[in-house]
């Protein structure tokens, strides 16, 4: 089988932005799922955003990695266009909130408690993030789209996969591990 992951790092995402998970959810489900998974044939795809500011697009078992890279370059443009069309964001908001506050068994309560403690994120900060997502302003999402575009202009791609997949991507430099 062919397996590859095609991430890029978005350096300009504001680490303190509370709505980056919402932007990631919109891009993953309304755009990448259709163009990389359904049309491109990858087994999975998405845009992941962490509280640290680390953000990447990925695909899994992707037979068209070169095309996926081209689709990733359009994430910011997609988000801008999607917001201009005034789509209802309610489903994305609910989905994002459910990911941020899942039902937890005692083991997970301890695990997340440790995670929040070591990341210095208290209940007040969590509540502020939930409220920011519930009361999101489309202009805030447009700022994230702008940050995606700015970062993509600067380049920086990391690909992990088979030699044939990587060779098809016509990269300037390939480092073998």
Which residue stretches match the model-derived regions?
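C-terminal regions of mature proteins
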Residues: 1, 14, 93-177
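His/Glu-based metal-binding/catalytic segments typifying zinc-dependent metallopeptidases
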Residues: 1-38, 177
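Short beta-strand-to-loop capping motifs
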Residues: 13-15, 58-63, 161
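Short, conserved charged micro-motifs
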Residues: 17-20, 64-70, 166-169
């Amino acid at each position: 089988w062919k397996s590859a992951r095609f991430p890029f790092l978005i350096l300009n995402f504001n680490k303190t932005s509370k709505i980056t998970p919402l932007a990631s959810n919109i891009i993953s489900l309304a755009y990448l799922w259709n163009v990389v998974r359904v049309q491109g044939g990858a087994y999975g795809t998405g845009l992941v955003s962490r509280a640290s500011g680390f953000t990447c697009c990925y695909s899994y078992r992707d037979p068209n990695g070169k095309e996926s890279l081209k689709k990733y370059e359009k994430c910011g443009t997609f988000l801008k266009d999607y917001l201009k069309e005034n789509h209802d964001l309610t489903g994305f908001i609910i989905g994002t909130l459910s990911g941020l506050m899942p039902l937890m068994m005692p083991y997970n309560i301890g695990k997340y408690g440790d995670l929040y403690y070591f990341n210095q994120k208290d209940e007040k900060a969590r509540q502020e993030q939930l409220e920011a997502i519930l009361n999101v302003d489309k202009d805030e999402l447009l700022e994230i789209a702008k940050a995606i575009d700015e970062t993509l202009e600067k380049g920086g791609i990391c690909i992990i996969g088979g030699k044939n997949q990587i060779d098809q991507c016509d990269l300037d430099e390939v480092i073998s591990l």
